[in-house]
Amino acid sequence: MGLGWFGISSVWLLPMVWRYVARVMAGERGLKGPGTVRIWLATLAVLCASASLEALTSGRDLHGKAGGAVGRGLASLFGHMLGWTGAFLLMLGVLLWVAPMVFGHSWRQLLARLRQAGEAPPVQADARHDEADDGLKPTALGLGGAEQAMGSGHAGASRRHGIEAGSAWRQPAWQPPPRTRESPPQPGEIWPLLNAQGRPEMPLPVAAQPAPVPVPAPAATPKAATQAPSSRSALRATIVSSPFHRPQPSDGDQPPSSPEADDAPSAPVEDAAPAISPAAEPDAPASAPPEPAEPSPPTVDLEAVRQEAEALLAELRGLMTPLAAAPVASPEPEPEPEPEAETEVTPEAEAEPEAEPEAEAEPEAEAEAEAEAEAEPEAEAPAPESVAPALQEAEAATAAEAPLPAPEPAPAIEADDAAPPPPAVPAQKPRIVLPAVVGQVVSNAMPAPAPAAAPVAAAPPAPPRVVDYRLPNVALLTAASPDTVAVPAEHLEETSHLIAQRLAEFKVPVTVAGASAGPVITRFEVDPAIGVRGAQVVGLMKDLARALGVTSIRVVETIPGKTCMGLELPNARRAMIRLSEVVNAPDFQSHASHLVLAMGKDITGNPVVTDLARAPHLLVAGTTGSGKSVAVNAMILSMLYKATPEDVRLIMIDPKMLELSVYEGIPHLLAPVVTDMKQAAHALNWCVGEMEKRYRLMSALGVRNLAGYNQKIRAAQQAGHKVPNPFSLTPDAPEPLSTLPMIVVVIDELADLMMVAGKKIEELIARLAQKARAAGIHLILATQRPSVDVITGLIKANIPTRVAFQVSSKIDSRTILDQMGAETLLGQGDMLFLPPGTGYPQRVHGAFVADEEVHRVVEHWKQFGEPEYDEAILAGDPAEAAAGELFGEGGDAEADPLYDEAAAFVLNTRRASISAVQRQLRIGYNRAARLIEQMEAAGLVSPMGRNGSREVIAPGGGD
């Protein structure tokens, strides 16, 4: 990435060449004077730094052509010493540090300007400037030059075109250009004055001038009243056109000045206040004809003129005091109204001259002169073009009128220097009229100084960290115990003979065909004799269990693929099945689905896994202590071992606030673990909305499920295309679609959720169970009370995959599995698993996972960052929240003091009748109807049926 023109380029030499040409045109010594060496060194440093940057930014190819040999050499040198970044920052810092010096500025001057703009105390001048100001050189503009400046002819002045560059050692004498306006200026109009060097003068202090230092003069002449400021002074001044009388100009002109004239002594700066000429107007355009100067009487009282000018200047500076860069000790000026017309006044007066080195102050003076030229309302051309002829003419005129070279005493010494000035004579104050500019705003602030160069560019911000999710290692799980207890073959044979003998005693002849021992139970295959029905064997199971000395025997009437029955007897010693055994199994490792669940091991010891995406929902039920919560944890860990947050996101609802709260903070979560039932309803409602949104997207893309949708998005991304969102809020520029993760909703206790908001929750779960499979949203519902009021027919019909742990009755087993068998399970992880698509339950021993294992896996996932929660999941619908449809918080009926009594009556009597509540509570019909409707909104009673009756949904005290 070469910068082309940026390296060793003539662009950096233009300021120095321009300075040299301007000084030669002004008759100066072009390559000498203070500040020249600094400009030379700054130009050399800028060339080297820019060439090095050119070489460094050309793709780090230090052998290329970018930057030249010098740039490549410096880049190679500093690159080896500091590295590429260090060399780049070093060269950039050098470039920014010396760049202002190429143009004659310095960082100190720029910072001083910033402090002046902020009304900070002025920066004190260097001691060498103070010493230089104590012995100022004689002015280049003599008495004749001052008188000629007041004239209107300028006949002897030769015109030179082009803007003159000021000298850092000795400024050329300037003469103000002729008036070019068609009408004379109004009284009190402010014009900037250019000093003898060709630079605008600084405004003098606001305070009345102190007594001048007595300077012995061999010849005091009246011409001292119009003496120009010193050539070494870097101050600015303003000229006020006022109706007081001017001194009569002299007829004679002084001969041109020579270089030796700079060595003559000059008057102090304090005495230059009355030497202000009202005719110096360099900002006027040169297009209009000159205006004749105002005639002056032949004899003028110099002291009266001086005092009148001082009074007028003090009054004008009162207007400019708020604009000064720093406060100056002075008497309080008379308050004057703020001018409403725009006039750019840049007072920079100081009691002591605090000019920077003149090589640095020269560009500042030129910039301010340009700024004032732009502020002049009558200017019809850009500032440099309009000022250039006037500046050249003034220079030629004043150069011709400069005093003689110094072997002679300086004739321009003020007569007032010999004695203190008399008291000021009261005079009528002229009316100050400022030129108005239409369409511009009055600016009371100083012109903004040149902005400081930008600091060294900081290193570019690091790109966003791409999270490289790593699946947890199996070592985080506890390994299985190696000392497994195997059932000996002799024990199996002995038990087989004992089963046949006991059944023969009950006149049910059978033959034991075989036995297969597992980690928890042993299955004996029994072949009934001819004429023996299977029901006869099932009816003898309790007697057979008592005869064999076991807790329970489960009869499998039909074994798929075989003609025999199965008798499942528990082992004398149960083996613990660890989750690590199932996760390490090939069936789990080679499974392609991200939603594979490690269920456990079957009766023969083979690992059992299932795919939740094919289930597509799972219902888990079992009594307390049956291993239901451990199985849910094992299922969640199975998904955490197979899926990253980009593939699967989880929503966990834990009313007990114990089982699932340990997963708080893993990146898979879409929302914090929900423990409030109101937020649980909001989460399910959000899932329904997300399901509808995904269906619309899949329909627009022409795919049938979430896997097809993601495959189409990935194929487009690999081809370099973006699939636009067909439902974007900005159809003109739709955002591209991205892959969508699967969502698993885990509810640990459905019974509590149904009890609080049963009807609404049932509808939401039913909708998700019916349609959410293709949208990639799956449910895992767990409950410890598998009754019909919790697992309703609507939920059970849409969740074909079920897991039944030990239950207390055959009715609960039928509620879960639609068949018996769960009541005979052993507990502690012993389950009946009903796979999808089959009506045959499979006995599985669930994998055990300890709390320490869960914590280790959770900590592994937490190291990849915080989860990205969707706040809309738990926020809920504002309209629904306001109406209080779920919990009745927005209605007035629940606020009724009789609501609790009415609800208790309905739940106890199981009668949701308005008339019954009316009679029981002795209230009116309308009030009783509102109470019943509020119970319906809270999910206690069902909506009104066809015959007008309602059912009590929530369990009462009798259950």
Swiss-Prot record:
GO function term, MF aspect, one: ATP binding
Lineage, highest ranks first: Bacteria, Pseudomonadati, Pseudomonadota, Betaproteobacteria, Burkholderiales
Gene Ontology annotations of biological process type: cell division; chromosome segregation
Keywords in alphabetical order: ATP-binding, Cell cycle, Cell division, Cell inner membrane, Cell membrane, Chromosome partition, DNA-binding, Membrane, Nucleotide-binding, Plasmid, Transmembrane, Transmembrane helix
Protein name: DNA translocase FtsK 1
Transmembrane segments: 1-21, 39-59, 83-103
Gene designation per UniProt: ftsK1
Region (Disordered), start-end ranges: 122-427
PROSITE patterns: FTSK (PS50901)
